[in-house]
Design a protein with these regions (language model features):
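Active-site helix-to-loop segments that bind/position phosphate- or nucleotide-bearing substrates
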Residues: 1-127
Length: 127
């Protein structure tokens, strides 16, 4: 999902700030995920737990590990997709944008950093 937004811009997904590039991994994808994990993924998890959408029967336990089973993954992906398509007011644009589009806006800020040599100011949760 982040990678698809990177590909819609002029950025090279192999060039990053935080993560070491590897042969079979796009490190910029990982850098941007660090910014948005708490905002998107963690909130989806808390929603699923607080609304009791995910229950113990949605997990499989093997050895000392616990995994979402197929029905649990389906619930998670549906809620994750709903979150990506929901909107919030983006401070600099002063209008609502989807969380998905917000990822692309972050890519544009990186491009601006490269081209205009302006300091990069990553997205911050503002509530």
């Amino acid at each position: 999902m982040i990678l698809s937004e990177i590909f819609k811009t002029q950025l090279d997904p192999k060039v990053s700030y935080l993560h070491e590039p590897f042969e079979r991994r796009y490190s910029l994808n990982l850098d941007l995920s660090e910014i948005f994990k708490p905002l998107i993924v963690d909130r989806v998890i808390f929603t699923l737990i607080n609304k009791e959408m995910i229950k113990p029967e949605h997990f499989d336990q093997e050895l000392n590990f616990c995994y979402l089973n197929d029905s649990g993954r389906k619930i998670f992906i549906q809620e994750f997709d709903r979150k990506l398509n929901s909107t919030l007011k983006y401070p600099k644009l002063e209008r609502k944008v989807s969380y998905r589009y917000m990822l692309r806006l972050e890519c544009y800020k990186l491009i601006k950093n490269f081209l205009e040599k302006k300091p990069y100011d990553s997205f911050k949760i503002y509530w």
